[in-house]
Design a protein with these regions (language model features):
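Short, positively charged and aromatic/hydrophobic N-terminal segments
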Residues: 11, 15-18, 24, 30
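P-loop (Walker A) phosphate-binding loop of NTP-binding proteins
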Residues: 44
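Conserved lysine of the Walker
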Residues: 49
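Short beta-strand-centered segment that lines the nucleotide-binding/catalytic pocket of NTP-utilizing
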Residues: 62-77
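ATP-dependent NMP and nucleoside kinases share a basic, alpha-helical "lid"
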Residues: 126-178
Length: 238
C-alpha cells in the first residue's frame, strides 16, 4: 500500500517487485490454466486513467483486453432523456457492479463475454454489445472500480491515478464537449453538483486499496515500469 501518497519511481520499483513476489505462485498457477491476470486502473474523472490503460493496450494489442467501467451504467429506459441527463452518474448506485463481477469471472474461466455499450449522447445503454476475449491480461478502468469489494477482489493488481483537480476538470470538459456533444454550462453544472462531491465522497477514498498510486496518467516512468511488469507476466505464459 502507498498510504494514499504518490510514489517515487524508486518506490514504484519496490512495489512492483513486492507485487511480483507476492503473486508469483498464484500467477504461475493461473498461467498453467491460461487464466487472465486482471489489472484495475482507477482514479477521478479526467485523471488520465483511460489514457494510461489505452497505452498499455496499444503496447500489447493481442495480449490485453480492455474493459471500461463506463459501459456498465444501469439502463434507464423508463426515464425521459432530459431527466436522464440530470442523474448522478458518479455515485456507486449508478453502476451494475454485479454484471462486472460476473463477466470478469467468466473471463477468468476462459469464456468470452458480451460487454454492454453505454451511449453518452442518450445517457443510456445502447442495444449494442462488445465481445471481450479472455486474453492473458484484462485491464478494467473506471472511477469506482475499487469501491465494490467483490469487484476489487477480482483484481490481481490495483493502480490508482492521482491528478490535480484543475487538470481533471479541464480534461473532462474537453472530452464531454468534443466526444459526448455536451455544452460547457452543462459540464460545469454536473461537475459542481455531482462529479466533485462524489469524487471526494466515493472515488478519492478508494485509493487506500491501491497497490500502486501514480502521479498523473502521463507518468512515463510509471508507464514503463507497469509495461515491464505486464511483459513478465506474458513471458510466464510461454
Amino acid at each position: 500500500m502507498c498510504d494514499g501518497k504518490p510514489v517515487s519511481p524508486l518506490t514504484l520499483c519496490r512495489i512492483l517487485e513486492y507485487t511480483r513476489e507476492k503473486d508469483s505462485t498464484r500467477t504461475k498457477d493461473r498461467c498453467l490454466g491460461m487464466k487472465p491476470y486482471i489489472i484495475g486502473i482507477a482514479g477521478g474523472s479526467g485523471s488520465g486513467k483511460s489514457t494510461f490503460a489505452g497505452r498499455l493496450k496499444e503496447a500489447f494489442p493481442e495480449s490485453i483486453s480492455l474493459i471500461s467501467c463506463d459501459n456498465y451504467y444501469l439502463r434507464h429506459d423508463d426515464i425521459p432523456l432530459a431527466e436522464r441527463a440530470l442523474l448522478n452518474y458518479d455515485a456507486p448506485e449508478a453502476l451494475e457492479f454485479s454484471l462486472m463481477v460476473q463477466q470478469l469471472e467468466q473471463l477468468k474461466n476462459g469464456q468470452p463475454v458480451l460487454c454492454p455499450v453505454y451511449d453518452f449522447t442518450l445517457h443510456n445503454r445502447s442495444d449494442k454489445v462488445i465481445e471481450i476475449l479472455p486474453r492473458p491480461i484484462i485491464l478494467i478502468d473506471g472511477i469506482l472500480i475499487f469501491h465494490d469489494p467483490a469487484l476489487r477482489n477480482c483484481m490481481d493488481l490495483k493502480i490508482y491515478v492521482e491528478t490535480d483537480a484543475d487538470e481533471r476538470i479541464l480534461r473532462r470538459a474537453r472530452r464531454d464537449m468534443v466526444e459526448r456533444g455536451r455544452d460547457l454550462d452543462s459540464v460545469i453544472h454536473q461537475y459542481l453538483t455531482t462529479v466533485k462531491p462524489m469524487h471526494n465522497t466515493y472515488v478519492n477514498p478508494t485509493k487506500v486499496f491501491a497497490d500502486i498510486i501514480l502521479n498523473g496518467g502521463k507518468n512515463e516512468q510509471a508507464f514503463q515500469l507497469v509495461k515491464a511488469q505486464i511483459q513478465q507476466i506474458l513471458d510466464s505464459h510461454k
